[in-house]
Structures are given as C-alpha cells and as structure tokens.
Curated annotation (Swiss-Prot):
Molecular function per GO: ATP binding; ATP-dependent protein folding chaperone; unfolded protein binding
One Pfam family recorded for the sequence: HSP70
Domain of life: Bacteria
Protein name, UniProt field: Chaperone protein DnaK
Biased composition (Low complexity): 608-619
Length: 641
C-alpha cells in the first residue's frame, strides 16, 4: 500500500513529510531544501517554474510570478481583503465569471487552486523521488480559520495536482500532533498553538489526553484571521522604505513594478535578519532612474523601528487568543504549554507578546516551519492504518446556519463543535400555499445572515398547498471530518428530499476541475519534454566542446577533407541547438559523432603510442636504479667496518 504523505501548503513556503519506519521524515526537495517557496512563475517559452527557481527570477518577471496565492483561494473578488491585495500585488488579480478572485498571467485566467496545484505537484514529486514509488494520496493542511469554500478550494487544488486528498486537517492541530507524540510527560495537558504564518493567523486550544494507551487530541476551540501574516509585515517595511525614499529622492517607487519586486525581496530579508540582529542595512543600487540619472537606495533599519512599524499587526493576534481561551472554557493559568508555529514566530517581539499574554515562556523545541507537515504525515499514517494509537478530534471554526424569516441567521451548528457532526432542525413555510422553500446556507457569527459568508443555496420543491406554518421541513447539517458541509432538506409530509454538498456559490465546477486536471497532465508532459530537450542540449554542448578541444590537439593529423567534415558537423549542431527539438538535436549529435570517428581513431593511436613510449622509458630507467640499490661491495665495506 502506498504511503499517504502530509503536505503543509503554506502562503509563503510549503513542506512535505511522510512517516517512514515509524519516524516522521521531512523530505528535501530537488534543490536540497526542506521547505519550498510557494511561488509559481510562468515563462514566455511556456515553461512553469515552481519554488526556488521561480523565486530567483521574480525580480525580472514580476507580472508572471505568482506568490501568496493562498490568500485568494476560495475568495470572492469583491471581498475587502482581496481588493486590498489588488493594489499591492505586482501580478493581475481579476474577477472570474462566477465572481471569484482569479489571477491573470500571460493573457490566461487561472483559478487559485490551479496555481496551488503546481506547488502541490512539486511536493508530490519530491515525495515520489524520496520513496521511489508513485504517491496518489495526501493529507493537506489549512488554516484552522479557513471557511468551507476555502477548504473546498484546497481540496480541488489537490485533485488538480493528481492527489486524492484523504483529509483536510487544521494547521494548529497538525502542529499539536507533531508536538504531542514526541512528549513523554504523563497525564492530560492543555496546550495553545499560536500559528503566525506567511498569510494567515490561527490560535487553537488543544487538550492532549492519554485514554487507554491511545493519545487523544481534542481541539477545545480555535480562532484567527485568514488575512494576517508575514506578507503584511513585509508590506509595512516596503511602505516605510517607499516613504523614506520619496522624502530623500522625491521619487515614488510604488508605481514601479520592477522596483517593488526588489523591495519585497529586500524587506523579507531585512525582517529575517532583524530577528537575530539589532540593525540591518537595505542596499539596492540602481533601484530606479529619473532625468538626473540612476538612483540608489541605502537605508538602515533597526529592530526597534521594525517593531514600531508592525506593533499593531502583532497586537491584532491577541484578541483571537482571548476569544479562543474564553470559548474553550479555560483560564490562561490552565495552559501547560505554548507552541509557536509559522516563520513569523521567530520574531522576538512576537515571542514577547505571546509570553506576556499567556504568562509563560513559549516552547522552543518545535520547528515552526516543519511541525505542520510532520503532523499531517502522522495523520496520514493514522488514516492508512499504520498508526492506531492516535485519535484526533477537531472542530469547526465558525458557526453554520440558514437564513430564516426577516433575514435572521438561525445557527444549526455552533462554532468549535467537534467534527464530524450532524444536526437536524424542523422549519416551516412563511406563506400560505408556498410550493417551494429556498435553503440559504451561511457561515459566521453575525445575527443577520447577510453579514456572514454565504456558502450556497438550493430549493426544495413540490410542497403540497397548505397554510403557512403547517408543512414540516427538516433541515439537516452534516459536517465531515474534513470540515466540509453537506446539507439536506426533507418535507416530512411527502418524504421529498433534496441535498447538496456545499460548493460555495462560487467555487470550481466538476467540469472546470476535470479541465484543470487535464491541463495539469498536459503541463506535466510538456515539462517532461522541456527537461528532455534541456538534457539533449547539454549533451550536445558537451560534445561540441570536447570535439573542438580534440580538433585543436589532433587536427593536423587528419586529412583536410576529414577536418572539414567535422567542422561542418559542429556548425550544423550549433545551428540546430538554438531552435531544434530533441529529435533534430539527437540526429545532428549522431552526425557529429560519426564525422569524428577518424579523429577518435587518431587520438586513440596517439595515446597508445604515448603509453608505449612511457613504458619503454620506465623500463630503461629501471635498470640503473637496480644496480645502485644492490651494491654488494658497498654493503661488504659496511660490514668490515
């Protein structure tokens, strides 16, 4: 049975792990790194770059290099958070036909799950290279505070990448799994997972208990902000640099896409450096130019300045912590451990704030970049039956309900309810002889339905004529272990029933997903073709170089016609290298190899002659050496003395 891998699909970086021989293995990618930047670049020759290669060329190709796409997944174009991102991102965010936020690259519209699928495909390939077998199943993590449509979109991304997503698991819960299974402390423990990543913030209160030899992880509550993370911290630094540069040079860099990409890179680097240093220098020569000539950017930033710039962002993480503690029904003093997850938690000011709120030092023995993928791999091993000593009880992060008379939100399932769960409630009609009801499903905490996130709607038709309030319509909400919702409505009088799996009233249709899967497969073939072409070009280059070198050394031993034939074959191969496909290059390589045979024979004959000459020389030198060594007279004299 093939392994179920664990993937942390992050906003900034992604990571893949697997349980191998009972131990969690974080798998290095082709570049040798344990995490992969969640960046996808679309090149003008049709090639798609993922990870570090995409990040390296971002400055030169900002409009076609997509990063932080997770912030758009499962979101509407008109949402306030998306509108804010449109002004900040160098790439184009557009409105899809169904109202979703999509991106546009090289004239082609792409859904965020399609872009995320490229990252997932790299994670899949990374695992396959390590395991030496095909991988088809995965557990993928999402922020705990992701709503239903964001979870659905993540699942869609997995399918497009050729993965069957066995479970969607919350990031803090995954981190708790990775932490809890390592620990030897006995007894029940309540822990807080504070997860501040590249694009999202989550906090979960989790109880770890030992129940008859089985480790039980029960999520008591969760809260967060799906639009708060390291990208926002970077943006504060970028805004500061832009304003300082404008003051000094009078030039506004915010309108220059290339400059913005360089600033993004520099801001991220400065932020990381200031976690260990008190001061850093941002030095970007030739950042822009005006009539007076090129402009250079040189700016010192202290840790204190950075902390002042992002203080309000760090403060925003504390209110969700307060709510999570209250919802869990515990006091801060009941917490045994505080676990930090996500790269942003390396910032000393963040650690200080967490310590101040929870009144205890956060644990330092959890790798903030790898814990989530490790936990996903553990959950994968539980689902495959490899581990049987772990039970995970997660919760739904937001309340779910339907719109009833007067636009009121009637909650069916309260937030922080353990999943999977099922709940039914009976409703009736609002008008006499009403033939149908529309069930509108919402997710959120507001009393008025319109203030919450609309997840979808469907009709139950064929209700027999009756006075208002008489028909009995039973509505059932069923949340599966992935946190994805299924809703049904049944007329108790007639037995008529209608049900849907909530696909956000946006989201991708089955046809769209299938089309994207086919696109992805075609891309994989194209990638394979490009890789083979690159390999053929490299081999051809090496052959040209080696033949030229040999021609310089041994060319005078060839007849003029032979030499001309080789030079012509070299020129033919060099000409075809720039434009030819693999078959054409291979044919010219073969032609050059054939033309060079005589040269090879001359080289071989020359080398043999050299070897024979060296052996003869060695034999001649050996005789006098022997005479010198065995000198009986000399030895005799020595003895007499």
């Amino acid at each position: 049975m093939s392994k179920i891998i664990g993937i942390d699909l992050g906003t900034t970086n992604s990571c893949v792990a697997v349980l191998d021989g009972g131990q969690v293995k974080i798998i290095e990618n082709a570049e040798g790194a344990r995490t992969t930047p969640s960046i996808v670049a679309y090149m003008d020759d049709g090639e798609t770059l993922v990870g570090a290669p995409a990040k390296r060329q971002a400055v030169a190709n900002p409009k076609n290099t997509l990063y932080a796409v997770k912030r758009l997944i499962g979101r509407k174009f008109d949402e306030k958070a998306v509108q804010k991102d449109i002004d900040l991102m160098p790439y184009s965010i557009v409105k899809a036909d169904n109202g979703d936020a999509w991106v546009e690259v090289r004239g082609k519209k792409l859904a965020p799950p399609q872009v995320s699928a490229e990252v997932l495909r790299k994670m899949k390939k990374t695992a396959e290279d390590y395991l030496g077998e095909e991988v088809t199943e995965a557990v993928i993590t999402v922020p705990a505070y992701f709503n239903d449509s964001q979870r659905q979109a993540t699942k869609d991304a997995g399918r497009i990448a050729g993965l069957e997503v066995k479970r969607i698991i919350n990031e803090p819960t995954a981190a708790a799994l990775a932490f809890g299974l390592d620990k030897t402390e006995k007894g029940d423990r309540k822990i807080v997972v504070y997860d501040l990543g590249g694009g999202t913030f989550d906090v979960s209160i989790i109880e770890i208990a030992d129940v008859d030899g089985e480790m039980q992880f029960e999520v008591l509550s969760t809260n967060g902000d799906t639009f708060l993370g390291g990208e926002d911290f970077d943006q504060r630094i970028i805004d500061y640099i832009i304003s300082e540069f404008k003051k000094e040079q009078g030039v506004d860099l915010s309108k220059d896409v290339l400059a913005l990409q360089r600033l993004k890179e520099a801001a991220e680097k400065a932020k990381i450096e200031l976690s260990s240093s008190q001061q850093t220098e941002i030095n970007l020569p030739y950042i822009t130019a005006d009539a007076s000539g090129p402009k250079h950017l040189n700016l010192k930033i202290t840790r204190a300045k950075l902390e002042a710039l992002v203080e309000e962002l760090i403060e925003r993480t504390i209110e969700p912590c307060r709510v999570a503690i209250k919802d869990a029904g515990v006091k801060v003093s009941d917490i045994d451990d505080v676990i930090l997850v996500g790269g942003m938690t390396r910032m000393p000011k963040v650690q200080d704030k967490v310590k101040e709120f929870f009144g205890r030092e956060p644990r330092k023995d959890v790798n903030p970049d790898e814990a989530v993928a490790a936990g996903a791999a553990i959950q994968g091993s539980v689902l495959s039956g490899e581990r049987k000593d772990v039970l995970l009880l997660d919760v739904t992060p937001l309340s779910l309900g339907i719109e009833t008379l007067g636009g009121v939100m009637t909650k069916m399932i309260q937030k922080n309810t353990t999943i999977p769960t099922r709940y039914s409630q009976t409703f009736s009609t609002a008008d006499d002889n009403q033939p149908a009801v529309t069930i509108k499903v919402f997710q959120g905490e507001r009393e008025i339905a319109a203030g919450n996130k609309g997840l979808g709607e469907f009709n139950l038709e064929g209700i027999p004529p009756a006075p208002r309030g008489l028909p009995q319509i039973e509505v059932t909400f069923d949340i599966d272990a992935n946190g994805i919702l299924h809703v049904s409505a049944k007329d108790k009088g007639t037995g008529k029933e209608n049900k849907i799996t909530i696909k956000a009233n946006s989201g991708l249709s089955e046809d769209e997903i299938q089309r994207m899967v086919k696109d992805a497969e075609a891309n994989a073939e194209e990638d394979h073709r490009l890789a083979e072409l690159a390999q053929a070009r490299n081999q051809a280059d090496a052959l040209v170089h080696a033949t030229r070198k040999s021609l310089t050394e041994y060319g005078e031993k060839l007849e003029a016609a032979e030499k001309e034939s080789i030079e012509a074959a070299i020129k033919d191969l060099e000409d075809i290298l720039k434009t030819g496909d693999k078959a054409e290059i291979d044919a010219k390589v073969e032609a050059l190899s054939t033309a060079s045979q005589k040269l090879g024979e001359k080289m071989y004959a020359d080398m043999q002659a050299q070897q024979q000459a060296q052996q003869q020389q060695a034999a001649d030198n050996a005789k006098p050496v022997d005479d010198n060594v065995v000198d009986a007279d000399f030895k005799e004299v020595k003895r007499d003395q």
